[in-house]
Each structure stands twice: as C-alpha cells, then as structure tokens.
A protein has these predicted regions:
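Conserved N-terminal beta-strand and adjoining loop/helix that marks the start
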Residues: 1-16, 36
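Short secondary-structure junctions
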Residues: 54-61
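Conserved Nudix-box catalytic region and its N-terminal flanking loop in Nudix hydrolases
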Residues: 14-53
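NUDIX/MutT-family hydrolases
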Residues: 83, 92-123
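Hydrophobic packing within well-folded, soluble alpha/beta domains
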Residues: 46-52, 64, 82, 99, ...
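Charged phosphate-binding loop/patch that engages nucleotide di/tri-phosphates or the phosphate backbone
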Residues: 115-141
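Active-site-adjacent beta-strand/loop module that shapes the phosphate/pyrophosphate-binding cleft
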Residues: 58, 68-90, 100, 123
Length: 141
C-alpha cells in the first residue's frame, strides 16, 4: 500500500485544488496538493515537502481531516488529508497543469481523482449542515 498525504488548504470560503499533469496517471484530474511519503519521513514532513516542491509554499500542518484507502487498478493508496494553512508564499504551478481556489458549491464543476470522492462528499455534507446552522442563527467554526 502506498502512503500518500494531501492538504486541505482554506482561504476564506474557498479551498485549493490542483490539476494533475496530462502525462501522469490520472492525468488532468483534480486533486488536493500532496504526494507520497518517502522512507524515513513523517506524514507531516512529507506534506510540507510536497507543498514546497509542487506549489513553492510553506504550510503549517494541522489536524487530520480524513483517512481514505482507495484501490486503483495500478495501486492501492492510503491517503491522509490534513488541514493545512499557507505560512509563507503564494501558490505557483510548479508541477500541476493548473491550480484553483474553489468553493464547496463548485466541486461538481471539476473531475477529481476517485480517491478524493469520499472526501468531497464529507465536505459537501459539512457545508450543508453549516449553512443550515447559519440559517438557524447558529454560527459554527
């Protein structure tokens, strides 16, 4: 099983997504920034390294948002998605075809990697319940 980490980076009501390069597996699909954990690295160290390599930013790694195991035809991944924030830098497209800041409502406009679907479902559900709570006069966060 391949250990993979990714970052859920929020900026206001939007979060960062990245489009995979066309020449890679699952090319042109959208994903959260991240990558494989190298031998001797913690998951948090791997995430900091991947964000620096792929976006030229330094991130502060927070709590785990979700763990997912997904079987692709060519490999099985254990994906850990962390909350993260940009501590330094502005995201740049160093390895991705494109990067975007999107709202939860815009998720369906993008085709994501299959491993991310369960994460996106959770984001949609949380968004609906937060909007409902705000409507009722309660404020979460």
């Amino acid at each position: 099983m391949t250990e993979v980490v990714a970052a859920l980076i929020w900026e206001g009501e939007t979060f960062l997504i990245c489009q995979r390069p066309a020449h890679k597996a699952r090319g042109l699909l959208w994903e959260f920034v991240g990558g494989k954990v190298e031998p001797g690295e913690t998951r948090e160290e791997a995430l900091v390294r991947e964000c620096r390599e792929e976006l030229a930013v330094t991130v502060s790694v927070g709590e785990v948002f979700m763990d997912v195991v997904h079987e692709y035809p060519d490999l099985t991944v254990h994906l850990t998605l962390f909350h993260a924030s940009i501590a330094e830098g502005v995201p740049q497209k160093l390895e991705h075809n494109d990067i975007r800041w999107i709202t939860v409502e815009e998720i369906d406009q993008y085709e994501f990697c299959p491993a991310d679907e369960v994460i996106l479902d959770r984001l949609r559900k949380q968004n609906r319940s937060e909007k409902g709570a705000r409507y009722a006069g309660l404020y979460l966060r």
